[in-house]
């Protein structure tokens, strides 16, 4: 099974999906979900609506001997806030059993809906090896499944 990245694709239901590269996967995916539903809202606007700016200085936690500073909120919070503030009805599901997760993904994409997925970047075969690390907060869009695997749009990648 392979995973193919796209730039422009016609979905099973006849709609056209256009890939947009984004500064961050979460805001890019959130923007794509709203565009798919007819609300043409940019990634920077999602960042603002979702309160993406955050600052924290943690002198009591050190990495390589230096205190940690952060400039973004926890993964998923921008999406959650933007969806709530824009009045979106969101269905979220978590799966401990990989097969149940794949079965549900296939069920939903067969209806013609695109699906946002959050997963660990380390295991993504399409992701450049130098960027792989254990981080279970990477987001991308699954468009549909074909005979070779899944067609996806990952806003963190150029195409």
Label each residue range with its predicted role:
Residues 2-98:
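Cysteine-nucleophile protease catalytic domains, especially the papain-like/related folds used
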């Amino acid at each position: 099974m392979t995973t193919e990245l796209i730039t422009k694709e016609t979905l099973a239901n006849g709609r056209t999906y256009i890939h947009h590269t984004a500064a961050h996967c979460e805001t890019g995916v959130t923007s794509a979900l709203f565009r798919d539903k007819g609300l043409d809202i940019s990634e920077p606007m999602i960042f603002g609506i979702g309160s993406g700016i955050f600052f924290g200085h943690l002198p009591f936690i050190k990495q390589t001997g230096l205190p940690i500073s952060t400039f973004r909120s926890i993964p998923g919070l921008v999406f959650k806030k933007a969806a709530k503030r824009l009045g979106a009805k969101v269905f979220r599901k978590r799966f401990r059993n990989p097969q149940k997760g794949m079965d549900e993904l296939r069920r939903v994409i067969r209806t013609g809906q695109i699906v946002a997925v959050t997963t660990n970047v380390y295991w993504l075969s399409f992701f450049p090896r130098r960027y792989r690390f254990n981080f279970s907060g990477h987001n991308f869009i699954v468009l549909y499944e074909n005979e070779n695997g899944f067609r996806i749009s990952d806003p963190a990648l150029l195409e």
